[in-house]
């Protein structure tokens, strides 16, 4: 009788250990096999998010269980998320719950009209081009930034920036105003004045140069060519 009890206890321990390992692997084992981006649009339904994750992660049953536990279906954040190999379902669910976005890189160069800039931005952030154009051409927005609708474009300094994918057009413009103020140091402004160019002309020239080359040692030569053309009319 005692022998049977011991055997039964051993079997129970093995079963419990097996269940524990199974659950641990399900919740904390690797559920992401390859790096990929996940875009969650504002106002998305939870079912849409689940469908996207079904194609991106393993252990989906465990994800659904944990997501239900933290009420992810009631509260998840839109944004751009990067699923990295080695992540588990707990990490993925918490990332979406807390809105731990990965910024996107936004390159501004060779744009001379609101429509061109809006088209470029709309491929890199959530807002559509029509909404972006509306903000870029809004006189009130330009005045708030300290410009008018004509000179607002001199604020956009050609470079590559990091934004959250969910950045609104208004937030984008505010950020670019800060970058503009940071760029125009007294030393740079004095150098610009000596060149005889306006800030708008400098920004236009910078956009052209940035489009032609990314090599910093070539930029002065190319800029000099265009400055000579401007002076010759």
Feature locations, PLM:
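Conserved catalytic or metal-liganding residues and their short signature motifs at active sites
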Residues: 1-233
């Amino acid at each position: 009788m005692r022998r049977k009890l011991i055997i039964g206890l051993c079997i129970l321990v093995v079963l419990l250990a097996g269940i524990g390992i199974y659950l641990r692997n399900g919740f904390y084992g690797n559920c992401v096999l390859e790096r990929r981006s996940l875009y969650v649009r504002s106002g998305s339904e939870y079912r849409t998010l689940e469908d996207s994750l079904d194609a991106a992660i393993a252990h989906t049953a465990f994800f659904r269980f944990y997501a239900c536990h933290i009420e992810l279906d009631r509260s998840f954040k839109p944004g751009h998320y990067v699923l990295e190999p080695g992540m588990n379902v707990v990490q993925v669910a918490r990332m979406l719950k807390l809105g731990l976005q990965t910024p996107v890189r936004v390159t501004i160069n060779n744009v001379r009209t609101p429509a061109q800039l809006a088209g470029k931005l709309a491929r890199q952030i959530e807002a559509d081009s029509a909404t972006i154009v509306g903000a870029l051409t809004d006189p009130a927005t330009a005045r708030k930034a300290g410009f008018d609708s004509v000179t607002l474009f001199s604020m956009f300094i050609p470079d590559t920036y990091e934004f959250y994918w969910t950045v609104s057009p208004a937030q984008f413009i505010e950020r670019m105003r800060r970058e503009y103020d940071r760029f125009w140091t007294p030393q740079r402004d004095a150098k610009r004045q000596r060149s005889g160019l306006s800030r708008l002309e400098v920004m236009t020239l910078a956009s052209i140069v940035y489009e032609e080359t990314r090599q910093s040692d070539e930029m002065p030569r190319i800029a000099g060519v265009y400055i000579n053309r401007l002076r010759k009319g």
